[in-house]
Every structure is written in C-alpha cells, then in structure tokens.
Design a protein with these regions (language model features):
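Conserved beta-strand signature within the Rossmann-like core of class I S-adenosyl-L-methionine
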Residues: 151-160
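Feature marks short, surface-exposed loop/turn motifs that line or immediately flank catalytic pockets
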Residues: 113, 162-164
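Conserved N-terminal segment of class I S-adenosyl-L-methionine
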Residues: 1-124, 128, 141-142, 157, ...
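Short glycine-/acidic-enriched loop or helix-start segments at secondary-structure transitions
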Residues: 93-94, 136-137, 165-167
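Alpha-helical subdomain
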Residues: 165-169, 173-185
C-alpha cells in the first residue's frame, strides 16, 4: 500500500495479520483498513448484503436507525432535500424520513445505482452503516462533498474503533464486507480536508456540516 485509503497520507505501517488477512494503519488519521488483495468480489459482496435482514417492517432495525436520524433531524428542516447514500436493498431510513414528511432520494451502487443523483445538490445526506464498506473512502467523500449544498449536513453511523489492542477480536472486523475502520481522529481529519465541521452527538455517530467560507 502506498497511501492511506482514507486521507492519502503515506505514513502507513502493517497493523495486523490474522486469518490470512492483512490490515494497515495510518499514523496520520488513525484509520485501519484491509489490504486490497483481501477484498471479496463484487458478486460475493452483493450476495452478502442480500442476507441482511433489514426489512422495512423490522421495528428493531427502524429503532436502530433512529440513532442517526434523530441527531440529523435536529439540524435540518422538513423542506430540506436529502439523500440516503448506500441505502441497501430495503431503504428503511428513507421510508422513515418520508413518513416524517421529508423529500429524500436514494442511492446504492448495488441496488439503486442511479447516476442522476450526482447531478443534484442535497441539504442532508445520511450514511447508515456504509462507510466501513468503502474500498475508496477518500474518493467517496469527495463525491459526497460534491453532492452537498452549502451548509448541508452529512450524517454517518458506523462502529467507531476504540483501543488498538481490541481490534483483533472485534466482531465488527469479522464481517468480510467491512474493510475500513475509523476513530474520532479519522473523522476529524476527513473534515479538515474539506470545508466541513464535525460533531459527535452520540456513540458511533458523526455529523459533518459543509460551511460557507465565501
């Protein structure tokens, strides 16, 4: 690996080798990520997502999504146009926002690959359990930045890393589609590389605000 896939720093070391997998660490942004040679194929990844039991009628899953929805709704108004980025095959987050009166679009590279969304601007973008799957997070965050209107909010929910020594036995690492892992420091670096402020309103939640510097 030549560069960190999150921040493009060259300050990399091998972090861990386990179960025939190699993980790298960035000494600048503190992200940990899987070596590219260990990525599963597109078809394997899609098959794995189809096993998720994230139906629109699953109340437990809908309650879980409120962990992101509630702090994000505190920052936006009902007439704001939003995007569920990486919505999966059953966009429950979109369904909740729509039932609350919001106008929201969907995008998912596997299930809703509508490229027209990249011609639009949004006042809020929600990514629930998405960023840990990104093979090219630096480039994806550029895409998201381009989708954000001025003063827009971008909400992320993912399991934050804690202590490095816990990583080997962390259940979150064992999902074959989870390839990149973040700390608060990582999200602060992501924000600093763009016109974003970042807040951490609750556990495993990051809210980014695209500020107007004009």
């Amino acid at each position: 690996m030549d560069n960190c896939i999150v921040c493009k720093s060259k300050c990399l070391d091998i972090f861990l080798k386990v179960d025939d997998l190699t993980y790298w660490k960035c000494k600048f942004c503190e992200a940990k990520f899987l070596d590219k040679k260990n990525y599963i194929s597109y078809n394997e990844e899609k098959k794995h997502y189809l096993k998720h039991n994230n139906s629109l009628s699953d109340q437990g899953y809908r309650d879980f999504l409120q962990c992101l929805i509630k702090p994000l709704k505190d920052k936006i108004s009902n007439n704001d146009f939003g995007l569920d980025y990486g919505c999966g095959y059953a966009p429950a987050l979109t369904d909740i926002f729509k039932k609350d009166g919001f106008n929201i679009d969907v995008y998912d590279p596997f299930f809703f690959p509508n490229q027209n969304i990249f011609l639009k601007k949004f006042k809020f973008i929600a990514c629930s359990e998405v960023v840990e799957h990104l093979f090219k997070p630096y480039e994806e965050f550029i895409k998201i930045d381009n989708l954000m209107d001025l003063n827009a909010w971008f909400g992320v929910m993912t399991s934050f890393m804690t202590e490095d020594f816990l990583f080997k036995n962390w259940h979150y690492r064992r999902d074959p589609t989870h390839v990149v892992f973040y700390k608060k420091k990582t999200f602060k670096v992501i924000a600093s590389q763009r016109r974003w402020k970042v807040l951490f309103p609750s556990k495993n939640i990051a809210l980014f605000n695209k500020i107007d510097l004009s």
